[in-house]
A protein has these predicted regions:
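Long, charge-rich alpha-helical interaction segments
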Residues: 212-239
Length: 348
């Protein structure tokens, strides 16, 4: 087994779910087989270990782009079964725009069940990974043929606590672990559960967060009555301080235009959509940016409110991608990208 996953809470949780529920005795992974990655970084595919015929390769919470497509084709060519689980709108747009010959190649692998995709923008990757693991969980006959995602329907209960596999037709109900619920709720910005924000803030300080093979992650998923409350309590202690810092940071923002879109911009290495307060609903989009000395690039993160624009389109125009209300990109220079409002003339 080889697992590539996004370096954020959703990706970490996806990888941990994979380790806890998708490992079998014939394909035991090591810590080195779990590879964190974020778009914009270098992924040296030539340096990967040899992939075995029939080995499963999971690509979790990583939108399809040039790098992920190269990784996918490399693994498929080596005889692996590639399972790509994602929920980013830009990834679907990328696949839709691929040349016909590339689409045909992926379709051939899909028809031979070598390339398995599970995609849904309304759910996070960790929720989709847990759903994928649940498709063959608790089946009466362990020797029965494994279910394929294309042949399985699924739903969640209205309270987002339970997965229903094949609803209405020999349906099975499987309870969703709290950590998966909270990471999902936060990542898609649904905010259904009252402890979602507290859990995700507290989770930022957890030392094993990016160690999906750890016994602590296994306990978080399987012994949640003991392991989840301390994280939630720590998060509630953080919220007040965080809000005060957000207010101070946001006061130093400025109005600008990016790709022709009016926006409110803040230069900060820290923050999420809540950084902008009510401004998120006062502008078509809000933007955070920072410079990474490590990668010598500017990181831009785009956010929009309920009535805002599709920021994934702005991100794509700058070489990035993401979701409708949350997206990002990395660029070499911002001089002609972020234009202060007083330096441009807007059409009425």
């Amino acid at each position: 087994m080889l697992v590539f996953y996004h370096k954020d809470n959703d990706g970490y949780c996806s990888a941990a779910v994979c380790n806890c529920y998708l490992v079998n005795g014939y394909d035991m992974p090591s810590n080195e087989d779990f590879i964190p990655y974020t778009h914009g970084e270098t992924l040296d595919i030539s340096s990967l270990r040899e992939i075995r015929e029939g080995e499963r390769v999971y690509i979790l919470d990583l939108a399809m782009d040039d790098v992920i497509l190269e990784l996918t084709m490399h693994c498929l060519s080596a005889g692996a079964v590639v399972v790509h689980i994602d929920h980013h709108k830009s990834g679907k747009d990328y696949i839709d725009a691929l040349p016909d010959v590339t689409k045909a190649a992926l379709d051939r692998y899909a028809k031979s069940t070598k390339f398995i995709q599970l995609f849904e923008t309304a759910l996070s990757a960790c929720m989709l990974t847990y759903i994928y693991s649940s498709m063959n969980m608790d089946v009466e006959d362990p020797n029965s043929e494994q279910l394929h995602p294309m042949d399985v329907s699924f739903a969640t209960t209205p309270d987002w606590t339970t997965i229903v596999i094949n609803p209405g037709v020999k349906e099975r109900k499987i309870v969703i672990p709290l950590a998966v619920r909270y990471c999902d709720d936060y990542d898609v910005w649904r905010w259904f559960h009252k402890d979602t924000e507290a859990f995700n803030l507290g989770f930022e300080a957890v030392p094993y967060r990016n160690n999906p093979c750890s016994k602590e992650w296994a306990a978080l998923l399987n012994k949640e009555r003991i392991t989840v409350p301390p994280i939630v309590n720590a998060g509630y202690n953080i919220i007040g301080y965080r809000d005060a810092q957000y207010k101070r940071i946001c006061e130093h923002g400025f109005e600008a235009t990016i790709c022709g879109v009016d926006c409110y911009v803040v230069n900060t290495p820290y923050g999420d959509s809540k950084l902008f307060g009510e401004k998120i609903n006062e502008y078509p989009m809000c933007v955070m940016y920072r410079y990474s000395g490590k990668y010598k690039k500017y990181k831009l993160e785009f956010r929009s409110g309920d009535n805002g624009i599709d920021v994934s389109e702005v991100a794509k125009a700058l070489g990035g991608g993401g979701h409708f209300h949350a997206a990002g990109c990395e660029i070499d220079n911002i001089d002609h990208v972020i234009l202060h409002k007083e330096s441009v003339t807007f059409m009425e």
